Amino acid sequence: MPTLDAPEERRRKFKYRGKDVSLRRQQRMAVSLELRKAKKDEQTLKRRNITSFCPDTPSEKTAKGVAVSLTLGEIIKGVNSSDPVLCFQATQTARKMLSQEKNPPLKLVIEAGLIPRMVEFLKSSLYPCLQFEAAWALTNIASGTSEQTRAVVEGGAIQPLIELLSSSNVAVCEQAVWALGNIAGDGPEFRDNVITSNAIPHLLALISPTLPITFLRNITWTLSNLCRNKNPYPCDTAVKQILPALLHLLQHQDSEVLSDACWALSYLTDGSNKRIGQVVNTGVLPRLVVLMTSSELNVLTPSLRTVGNIVTGTDEQTQMAIDAGMLNVLPQLLQHNKPSIQKEAAWALSNVAAGPCHHIQQLLAYDVLPPLVALLKNGEFKVQKEAVWMVANFATGATMDQLIQLVHSGVLEPLVNLLTAPDVKIVLIILDVISCILQAAEKRSEKENLCLLIEELGGIDRIEALQLHENRQIGQSALNIIEKHFGEEEDESQTLLSQVIDQDYEFIDYECLAKK
C-alpha cells in the first residue's frame, strides 16, 4: 500500500461542504488505506505441504518397500551420494521432517547445506519421484520466514522449478507450482524474480478443463501471489498476461478458485486509477457483482473488496460499478450477519458518496440510508465508524434536497448518541456533519426546527459537554456550534454568568478549559 496519510489528512476530506468533487475523489485512497491498515488479509501468503504424495512411488517407503528413518548425519551423507536410491531416501526423510505440523526444522535443514543438492535433484528428469520429493522439501522451506525463502531463491531454485512446469508428471508439476507460489508470496522482490524468470506463460499454459481441481487451485493461488504486494507493484506486462486468465477463472464454480481469483483482482485494484482502469476495462465488473451475492464468505469478501477498491477510482470507474449493479447488492450487505462484511460494504458506499451529487442521488434511489441508519444505531463500533465516514461524505457533497432526505432518514439520533464515543476522529467528524447540516438548514430557514430536533435528541447537552473535552479540536468545534447555532441560549447563560459574577461567586472559565 502507499504511505498512510495521517488521521488529520483523512479528516480534512469531510470538513467543508462544497469542497471540489475532484479533490474529494482524489482523497478516496486515504479512506481505503485506513480500512486496509486496520485489517489483515484473509488470504494466505504461504502454504506448507503436509499431505501430498507422489503417485508413482509410495511416499513412506523406498523403492524396495522398506520404511526408512535416518539421522541428520545420514541425510547429509545420503543427499551427497551418487546413488539415486540413497538420494531419494535422504531427500524423502528430510521432506518428512519439514512436513511436521509443529515446529518443522527449517533452519536445521538450511544450515545442514541441503538446499543446493535439492535444487540439483529438481533437474533429475530420470527420477520423477526424486524431483517430487526435492520440490516438496523446497516448498516447505520457502513457506518459512523471508530469510528461509531467500535461502531457496539464492540456492538457484526458481529456474529449475519453472522448468518442472513442463514435466509430464502431474504431481511433480503441481509441486513446482506450489513452491513458486510460496516464493512469490514472500514479497515484491521474489515475486519479481519469478516473473522475470518467465514463469507466467508456463503457469497459464497449464490451465485446462481437464486439470484436477487441487492443481487448478494451486495455480490460481500462485497467480494471485504474482499479483500481490506493492512498492513496487507487479509490472504492467505481468498484469496484462495474468488478467485474461483471471477472467476465465472467475467463471469457475469452485469457491477456492473463485476466492483466489478475486483476491488477485483486489491486489491489482488496490492502487492508482490507471491500475483500476486495467481491471475494469476487461469488463469484469458484472461478474464481480454476482460474486458479491455469494453465500461463501471466502468468495464474498474478496469480490466486495475488489469492488470497494474500484470505487476509490475516478467518477467514470465508479459509475461503471454502479451500472454493473453494485447498488443492488450493497444495501443487502449492510445487513449481513458478519460485521466484517457490513464494514466493507459501508466503506464501499462511503467512496460512492465521495463522488458528485448524481452518485449521491443514486444512493438515495437504491434506498441505502435505512440500513445505514440501522447500523449507526445497532452495529458494532468498528462498523459504526465506517458508517459515520459514509454519512460525512454524503453530507459534504450533497445538494440541499439530498441533505433534507438525510435528516429525514433519522440519521441525527444515532449521530448524537455517538458523540460520547471514545474515538476522537469519529467525534470530530460527527460535529462537522452536524455543523454542515445546520448551515444548510439556515439557508432554507429551517434552522430553528433543526435546533429543536437536536435538542429533543439530547444533542445540545452532549455538544455543550464536549466543550470541556480533553482534545482541543473537539472542544473548539463544539464551542463553534454552540456559539453559531444556539446563540440565544448562550446569551441567556452569559446573563446568568454575569449575575453570578456580580454576586462575587467563584466560577469556571469553560472557554479557557476547552482550549487546554
Curated annotation (Swiss-Prot):
Keywords: Nucleus, Protein transport, Repeat, Transport
Leader sequence residues: none
Entry-linked InterPro entries: ARM-like, ARM-type_fold, Arm_3, Armadillo, Importin-a_IBB, Importin-a_IBB_sf, Importin_alpha
Cellular compartments annotated: Nucleus
GO molecular function terms listed in the Swiss-Prot or TrEMBL record: nuclear import signal receptor activity; nuclear localization sequence binding
GO biological process: blastocyst development; epigenetic regulation of gene expression; negative regulation of gene expression; NLS-bearing protein import into nucleus; positive regulation of gene expression; protein import into nucleus
Entry keyword Nucleotide-binding: no
Disease as annotated in the protein's UniProt record: Oocyte/zygote/embryo maturation arrest 17: A rare cause of female primary infertility. In affected women, ovulation and fertilization proceed normally but embryos are arrested at early stages of development or cannot establish pregnancy after implantation. Inheritance is autosomal recessive.
Similarity remark: Belongs to the importin alpha family.
Subunit structure: Binds very efficiently to importin subunit beta-1/KPNB1 via the IBB domain; this complex dissociates in the presence of RAN-GTP. Shows a limited binding to the RB1 nuclear localization signal (NLS), but not to the SV40, nor NPM1 NLSs. Interacts with RSL1D1.
Classification via PANTHER family: IMPORTIN ALPHA
Protein name: Importin subunit alpha-8
